């Protein structure tokens, strides 16, 4: 008996689950920091900040950059900088800069993970409604899905500005299930991070945790999803479909 035999719809996280968005996000973060004459962070560090939406990303970036600047100045024997702008205002300015730069680099800095398009196509062909739940600012979501040619697979898309409470709160998942016309326990949620699994548990949805993606350096099994997969196309046999062996290039 399949663990997911009662599933009537599937919803996915975006960043770290369907797409590798770290190159574009990191580039935009670093350009915003540079514009404020702050140290740049680099992709490896920015990856550990992804997952809670753009505002939290800016807070994490600014906190790190200010600390890094203080450390560098101390190492060079220079006095600390007294910021004229309060941290809250600096976060707001950083967010405006980030939005501008991310709009310029999002498409060229985002790539589908292997097997994503094949898996979405197979699930759609089976007749399962598919949803997307992301904390990414809503204005960036639709253009990105279109550019990657996966918008056609989703009947429901919820961005970070479409609900008052983002993941790990259950509200976005409950809204997707409602729009699909199914109960939360009939909707499988697939994600790569602690926030995704916590949201699924809170909403009463069964969950799949993927081992790749962005999870603050934690192993996904620590969040105790119902099932853990190494590849997104491992979903297919679990939902009664053949396992796709088609290879997709990250740069396709």
UniProtKB/Swiss-Prot annotation:
UniProt record, GO biological process: carbohydrate metabolic process; DNA repair; glycolate biosynthetic process
Cofactor: Mg(2+); chloride
Enzyme class: hydrolase
Record bears the keyword DNA repair: no
Annotated catalytic residues: 13
Reaction equations catalysed: 2-phosphoglycolate + H2O = glycolate + phosphate
Protein name as catalogued: Phosphoglycolate phosphatase
Organism annotation: Escherichia coli O157:H7
């Amino acid at each position: 008996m399949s663990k997911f035999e009662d599933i009537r719809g599937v919803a996915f996280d975006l960043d770290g689950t369907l797409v590798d968005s770290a190159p574009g996000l990191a580039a935009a973060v670093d350009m915003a920091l540079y514009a404020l004459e702050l140290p740049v962070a680099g992709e490896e560090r920015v990856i550990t900040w992804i997952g809670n939406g753009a505002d939290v990303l800016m807070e994490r970036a600014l906190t790190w950059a200010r600390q890094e600047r203080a450390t560098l100045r101390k190492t060079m024997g220079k006095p600390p900088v007294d910021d004229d702008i309060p941290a809250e205002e600096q976060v707001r300015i950083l967010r405006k800069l980030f939005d501008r730069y991310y709009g310029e680099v999002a498409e060229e800095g985002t790539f589908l993970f292997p097997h994503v398009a094949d898996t979405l196509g197979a699930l759609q062909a089976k007749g399962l409604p598919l949803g997307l739940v992301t904390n990414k600012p809503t204005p960036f979501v639709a253009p990105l899905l279109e550019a990657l040619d996966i918008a056609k697979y989703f009947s429901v898309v919820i961005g970070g500005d479409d609900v008052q409470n983002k993941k790990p709160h259950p509200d976005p998942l409950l809204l997707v299930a409602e729009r699909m016309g199914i109960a939360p326990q009939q909707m499988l949620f697939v994600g790569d991070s602690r926030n995704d699994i916590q949201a699924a548990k809170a909403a009463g949805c069964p969950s799949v945790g993927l081992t790749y993606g962005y999870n603050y350096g934690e192993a996904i099994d620590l969040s105790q999803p119902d099932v853990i997969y190494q590849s997104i196309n491992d979903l297919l046999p679990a939902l009664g479909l053949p396992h796709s062996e088609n290879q997709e290039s990250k740069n396709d």
